[in-house]
Swiss-Prot record:
Gene3D superfamilies: 1.20.120.1630. GO terms for molecular function: protein C-terminal S-isoprenylcysteine carboxyl O-methyltransferase activity. GO terms for cellular component: plasma membrane. Its main location: membrane. The chain crosses the membrane at residues 1-21, 41-61, 72-92, 136-156. This is Uncharacterized protein HI_0318. Keywords: Cell membrane, Membrane, Transmembrane, Transmembrane helix.
Amino acid sequence: MLFINITFACILAIRFYSLSISIRHEKALIAKGAIQYGKRNSTLLSIAHVAFYFAAIIEANKQNLSFNSTSQIGLAILIFAIAMLFYVIYELKEIWTVKIYILPEHQINRSFLFKYVRHPNYFLNIIPELIGLSLFCQAKYTALVGLPIYLLILAVRIKQEESAMSHLFPKS
């Protein structure tokens, strides 16, 4: 259980580091005149994300888990998700935040990843992260209850993001 708790703390520290990047980018975007969209949804996503993390580790500690093959698969998925998070941050540079901000002269990223994967931050980072965390902590109840709730909030987020950016895409 000690390994799971220490690894969880490390993953949490990485997420806090990514949040600090987001806050720094957000301040710069606001200074450049960016407008935030979906503020209430961003708050709900943040609450759901934090709740998911804590529910998973509480569930793990109640079970007094050992690091087994399920946890190993979960950790591998988490490592993939974290790698994707930082790749997305690298690709989006200063426009990456955990919120939706659109600049007056917003440019669409057309790199390889964004060309072939729609919403890579959600589908290659967030969803795998939550699945990986559930497996790592063997938190089946957190997954069964938390994932559907999170996915509903995320679906709204994707629609809001697409709506906010619709003027940036040519009409066909």
